[in-house]
Structures are given as structure tokens and as C-alpha cells.
Amino acid sequence: MAGESTQVDLSVKAIGWGAKDASGILHPIKFSRRTPGERDVKIRVLYCGVCNFDMEMVRNKWGFTRYPYVFGHETAGEVVEVGSKVQKFKVGDKVAVGCMVGSCGKCYNCENGMENYCPEPNMADGSVYREQGERSYGGCSNVMVVDEKFVLRWPENLPQDTGVPLLCAGVVVYSPMKYMGLDKPGKHIGVFGLGGLGSVAVKFIKAFGGKATVISTSRRKEKEAIEEHGADAFVVNSDTEQLQALAGTMDGVVDTTPGGRTPMSLMLNLLKFDGSLILVGAPETLFELPVQPLILGRRKIIGSSTGGLKEYQEMLDFAAKHNILCDTEVIGIDYLSTAMERIKNLDVKYRFAIDIGNTLKYEE
């Protein structure tokens, strides 16, 4: 039952990198993971992605970080051991783990493949295992032990180093676009922001067979948006004339910028009748909601957070089929503190991935 705590055999020695307090200083942290059970998969971690969420969790921005904190919700590696009742995986398989390592399994959301909206989730990077009383540590470590249900099969033709950030950036944009029917050919979709999320959103839109228009604050990103990511058009969000010309032309808009920075009325004005505005950037402050454009155009606003296990797997398979990867800088573990500072200063294009397999070793 949720809330119960029982003794767990913690025999798997592990080492990760994380924080001991909210100072932002990172250290090697030794800890133990549970002995693999009959349905568990033991994974040798090879790569772990790093994003803005990790940087903010390290510093306890939202007030619920539990220290010592080992981050990591974008993890890829290979199977080194399986439990006696594991059916999906064998030793040597390439696998991945996203933001979740458990859920209640009984609520409406879990029963309908939306485990990420379970009210009692076990997050990979820091929540407790409510049924077992075990502390959870993230994927920035040499090894993980995870229930096979929450382990994803990694496509053979998808590189793990530049693909591992898809476990955050990829699913965050893939899930709501598919849910809102924007994965159909011919759809015109606007993307606000061309960072880690926006650049991947453009790639998915083009693979769906859609038209992608990037709206950014910086004219400098125009060449990159069109030539590197395949966007069909680019608009600076201060160009009111161009934006007015696009009014009522888009089936959907995906706002990947930090919430509240882009006027809601501006984004809603771009939508066709029945169009959808998707928000994936969390606002730090309240913002005004203009209701009239919603009423007069039957437009919709939705928020979205990652995806269910089925969506995760679909996203990875789709990315492999269409050669969708993230713009990724691969680093060693010793560069992690510098990487976190660069994320804080918006000095990365667009994601970091740590080469865990070659740079993080457990030593007695």
C-alpha cells in the first residue's frame, strides 16, 4: 500500500554525482540500490542527460529536493542482470529509463497508460519508493535497478549519446502534439523558442509531415532554425506585421519558453478555429488569460508533462525511424559542475549528455 515502509535489501553499491545541499556544489556521492528482485532489471548506465530541471532541482528551487540528491531523469545504458520473472529484457540489451521508476498502478491514469500523471509517482531522481520504503536516486550514477515495466527498449539504430536527451526534451513535445492530433501530415504548427525543446519540436513536426514556423526573440536564430532544423519559416516575436499576417493560420502552437514570457493573446491569435495552444514551460508567476479568443474561436489551451510509458517507447521508436536526435554536447563527469553553470547562464546548444560509462567508476 502507498505510504507503507518496509525493510529493503540494499546490496548494490553505487556512485553518483549530485548535491549535498542547496549551494549548487556537486560532489561524488556513494549510496546503495536495492538487490534486484524477480521483476527488476539491473542497468549499467552509459549516458545521462542534463537539463535545466536538474540544475534547478540541485539548488532546491521548488522546495522539495531531498538531500543528498543524485539527479538524472534521462538515462541510457545496457542490461547486466535480470530477475527471474523479467520477460521483456535480457542481458546485453540496450535500454533507457525516463523520469519515472514507479507508480501506484491502480489509479485511472495508470490503468490508461498515463503513469506520468499518477498522484503517487516514484520519480527517478528523488522520491521515495512508497511501497518499499527505499530512497530513490537518479540516473547520474554507474548503475540503476528498475522494475522492468519502467524500463524502455532502446532502438538499435539510435545513438545513445545524442539520443538520451529525448527522454526529456523529446517526450515533452511529442506527447501533447500527438494527443492534440498535431502529428498528422499538413498541420501548421508554431513553435515559440528554439532551445532544447523547441529545436526537437521542429524536428518532430517535420517528421510528422507538418509545417513548422519558429517564433523567437532573436533574429540570429533564423538560419539555424531553417537550415539546421528544417523549419519552414521564422518570425521574430517583435515583428507585429509578420505575426498579424500569420493570424488564424496555425493548427497548433507549442510554447517551449519559460511560462509567462510570451503574451497569451499573441499565441492565441495565431491559431485557427479549433486550434490548440500547448504550454510546456512552467510559469514562475501568474499570467492573464484572454478568454475572448478562446470563446470566439473554440480554441484550447493545454499543459503537458512528459508522457506515459507507451508514449515514451513510441517516441523513441519514431525518433529512430526518422533519425531525430538532440543537439548534444557530450561531456565527462568531471565537467559536470561547469556544465551546470553553463546551463544556468544559457550557454549550451542545446543539451548536455554525460559519458557515464567511460568517466564514472565505483571504487572502494
Curated annotation (Swiss-Prot):
Cofactor note: Binds 2 Zn(2+) ions per subunit.
Annotated residues for binding of NADP(+): 52, 194, 196-197, 216-218, 221, 261, 280, 282, 304, 306, 351
GO MF annotation list: alcohol dehydrogenase (NADP+) activity; zinc ion binding
Pathway where it operates: Alkaloid biosynthesis
Binding-site positions, Zn(2+) 2: 104, 107, 110, 118
InterPro entries: ADH-like_C (IPR013149), ADH-like_N (IPR013154), ADH_Zn_CS (IPR002328), CAD-like (IPR047109), GroES-like_sf (IPR011032), NAD(P)-bd_dom_sf (IPR036291), PKS_ER (IPR020843)
Listed EC numbers: 1.3.1.36
Keywords: Alkaloid metabolism, Metal-binding, NADP, Oxidoreductase, Zinc
PROSITE patterns for the chain: ADH_ZINC
Cofactor section: Zn(2+)
Catalytic activity: (19E)-geissoschizine + NADP(+) = 4,21-dehydrogeissoschizine + NADPH; (19E)-geissoschizine + NADPH + H(+) = (16R,19E)-isositsirikine + NADP(+); (19E)-geissoschizine + NADPH + H(+) = (16R,19Z)-isositsirikine + NADP(+)
Domain Enoyl reductase (ER): 24-343
Binding, Zn(2+) 1: 51, 73-74, 168
Pfam families, alphabetized: ADH_N (PF08240), ADH_zinc_N (PF00107)
Coiled coil: none
S-S pairs: none
BP term (GO), one: indole alkaloid biosynthetic process
Family to which the UniProt record says this protein belongs: Belongs to the zinc-containing alcohol dehydrogenase family. Class-III subfamily.
Function recorded in the entry: An alcohol dehydrogenase involved in the biosynthesis of seco-iridoid and derivatives monoterpenoid indole alkaloids natural products. Catalyzes the production of geissoschizine and its conversion to (16R)-E-isositsirikine and (16R)-Z-isositsirikine.
Subunit structure: Homodimer.
Name of the protein this chain belongs to: Geissoschizine synthase
Source organism of the structure: Alstonia scholaris (Dogbane)
